[in-house]
Amino acid sequence: MPLTKLQFQPGINKETTSYSNEGGWFDMDKVRFRAGFPEKIGGWTKIGTKSFLGSCRALHAWKTIALDNYVGVGTSEKYYIESGQGYYDITPIRLTQPPNENIDVSIDGVSATGEVGEVEISLDLDEVTGQEATGEVGRVGIVTNDDVMVIVPDGFVEENDALFATGEVGEVVAGGVSVSVEGVSATGEVSVPIVAITTLVPVITFSATNGSNEITVTHAEHGAVAKDFVTFTEAVSLGGNITAAILNQEYEINEIVNSDSYKIIARQVASVADITVDGVYTPTAVTANASDTGDGGILVTGAYQINNGLETSVFGNGWGAGTWSRGTWGSSASVDLLTDTLRLWTHDNFGEDLIINVHNGGIFYWDASASTPLDTRAVALSDLAGASNVPTVASKILVSDVDRHVLAFGCNPLGSSTQDPLLIRFSDQENAADWTPTTTNTAGDLLVGSGSRIVTATETKQQTLVFTDVSVHALQFLGPPFTFGINMISENITVASPNSVISIEDSVYWMGKNEFYVYTGRVQKLPCTVRDFVFSDYNEAQAEKVFASSNTAYSEVWWFYPSADSSTIDRYVVYNYVQNIWYYGTLARGAWIDRGIQDYPIAAGLDGYLYYHENGFDDGSTAPASAIAAHIESSQFDIGDGNNFSFVSRIIPDITFRNSSTSTPSVTFTMKARNFPGGTYLQTDDEAVTKTASVPVEQFTNQSFVRLRGRSMALRVESSETGMSWRLGSPRIDIRQDGRR
């Protein structure tokens, strides 16, 4: 019999059976198609040895005016800037809690009996017990007379612990202190003694137990949840092993006791970055002794970072809903359908600076031009100079590149703090902080008229597409006086998650709840040859984790998703928009950005590391790098519809090992035989195909002799060695008919 060339149609087809898909490919992992032929995908290498805390769900790369390359990394616990293979924590501060100040005032010996608020202290006070103030009064930290701070307003002198006006009586108020003691005003002679003293009252205190490394922190209405981070300053030693240096550092909250207290694990002095090992917070604990009876002193200040988010979406309510220790004992979980949603971030550049949004949370701003930007945290956008009516909550933000407006989706309306899930607001042009519409600016808002909530939005070259849970809308810049206009372009669609949409040139691709879609001027469902395979083994409860990414070097759109039995992402499906084919594989990733600013695509592993993809040939998550197991398997093929048995005696490989780094790359060719489409493979025969020379013509195993008999056959090609790169051509087999039984 003459040799038979094995040439299969590119792409994977799982919508039918293996036998009915004769002439095609049926299964694969970590293989792509180039010009119609299968090849092993590229490898990945770690970006440095440092790691980050939490599950990464968002990446954003950009370059500053000073040519600094930055990557924004949003995780379930923090927000980092990656620079020079290090991770710099810029997570915003939710609350800074200093000691309280109890102010007592007397005028000629008459003491104040009312609230502290009856004394107004202006910021022009410049002396505290004779020393220059370094901040607001009461923050200087000077303690006299057993925890009493004496405030000396400008225009007064201190004599014998009393304050005397140095000018006219009327200048008492102008000097910075307005005093009212049950109606008694500061009147009389010039030298009226006005005494204002501040007694510092601690808000945050510590309590240690002999033999334990747990420290109980008391802070009324702290607002924290488990795994939040707080940094303490100005604490003093508890008297023993728990020194001031141990207390005055950043801590992860280990357990929430109740709304007024929580626990931390005392640890040796180190930065959180230095004790983040393989993505895990790994402190070295310090145990208290019998001398640790103090409370940390009266000057303790705590800076609380914004609450961390969930790593896994939780459905339902009541006992067991949410994460252990996120609430107090006996408290209900505030859940309607999807509670305590997954921590997602959106981020975009405003010039060289970065605007950050916690999904269904606040909007923050990071100034890349600060004197030490990597040591500077992001701040609330509303705290910027000149800020006006900045949204306090939004589901997503982006910056319109065409017209330089900041857009907030699913945000609170002007004059209200209640989130409107269908509202779009936009800032003034070129002004990220001004959101108050006036006749002289371009700030404003729009309301989407379809759906129950805005799920996501993405910018194309011409417009911004806005996705609700049932429709797609086009948001376009019109200019004054309307600024933006919006119109519906499709309804009765679905979208899997806020990150399941990707824009490539003028096309937008997205994954729905049971379909794939594309927008190229109109919305269409994408015919998918692996649709049933994907959606029949898909954990819809974790759909928020689904994300889309592009690999434009290979004309690919990738969607990463969790399989049915996994709560984390473990699979991907790829659409090649040039070849119009589909394929899939297994890979655990949390976020991905295409090459552009960086030389390679960057992806976040679930192990706390970032990786350069399409870099090398191996799995760089291990040390040393390990092999990537890659394979592709054909559908069954036969002779004459399988009426006769077939006998295969020889395989003539056709493969290239171009660019492999190992000197002897090798793949395994396996022929499988079946008698019936639903039966098991009765025989397999595999042979290694090994490269032997590359000059002048690449040489490898000429032929392999096998003995295989069955009604139908399938070909499998696989590799599991390091340094391997291969691309399959058109192998041939020596096959002949061999009877009917």
Where are these regions (language model features)?
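Structural hallmark of WD40 beta-propellers
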Residues: 67-70, 352, 462
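Extracellular/lumenal glycan-associated surfaces
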Residues: 103-111, 126-131, 179-184, 469-471
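Predominantly extracellular/luminal cell-surface or secreted proteins
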Residues: 81-84, 231-237, 264-269, 366, ...
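Small/polar beta-strand repeat architecture
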Residues: 15, 94-98, 109, 113-115, ...
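Beta-propeller and closely related beta-pinwheel folds
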Residues: 43-60, 327-340, 373-546
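Hydrophobic or amphipathic alpha-helical targeting/insertion segments
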Residues: 352-366, 373-374
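Beta-rich globular "head" domains
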Residues: 221-236, 406-409, 642-659, 715
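Beta-sheet repeat architectures centered on beta-propellers
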Residues: 1-98, 310, 314-315, 324, ...
